[in-house]
Design a protein with these regions (language model features):
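Active-site neighborhoods and metal-handling regions in enzymes and metal-associated proteins
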Residues: 1-166
């Protein structure tokens, strides 16, 4: 997290958060700091955000130290497809719940629906989490100019988690 914070500062931005979950800790969507060291074969989930001026950023990416754990590449591919499905569905006039369904359907059809345990996305504006919320029940109609994240994930307890955030 220290290197990420230094990068934000070098870009005249203020670091806000840095979540790093390696191996089984990546299976907790908002993992808190612990003593576990990153090990060979770990999938590493990195969720970072900062603020430049008034506006926040929020991004999640994945990395692997060495060879990926069993099943990781399949899960990563499913989550990538879920992101793309949601991005394709997101356009003016569409309800937020339909964008959520686009991502959720990809994951459910692949057999991992029970492991997608959070909303698909949230608005980014003055606050890091604000409307529109991209959830299964949100009837908010998306409009041009709305800024929101798309961040589906699959979390396999005791193994690893994969989340990609656009």
């Amino acid at each position: 997290g220290e290197a990420i914070n230094k990068h934000f500062i070098s870009e005249s931005a203020k670091p806000q958060f840095c979540i790093v979950g390696s191996g089984p800790n990546g299976a907790f969507p908002h993992h808190h700091t612990g003593d576990r060291k990153v090990k060979q074969g770990d999938a590493v989930l990195i969720d970072i955000g900062g603020r430049k001026g008034t506006f926040p950023s929020d991004m999640t990416r994945m990395s692997v130290l060495g060879e990926p754990p069993e099943g990781y590449l399949e899960i990563h591919d499913i989550v990538e497809r879920a992101v793309q499905a949601a991005l394709s569905a997101a356009r003016p006039g569409v309800m937020a719940k339909d964008v959520d369904a686009a991502a959720r359907n990809v994951i459910t059809e692949a057999g991992y629906g029970e492991f997608f345990v959070h909303r698909t996305g949230h608005g980014l504006g003055i606050d890091i989490h604000e409307p529109p919320y991209i959830t299964a029940t949100s009837e908010v109609v998306l409009d041009e100019g709305m800024v929101f994240s798309i961040e589906p994930g699959i979390y396999l307890q005791g193994r690893f988690g994969v989340r990609l955030e656009e």
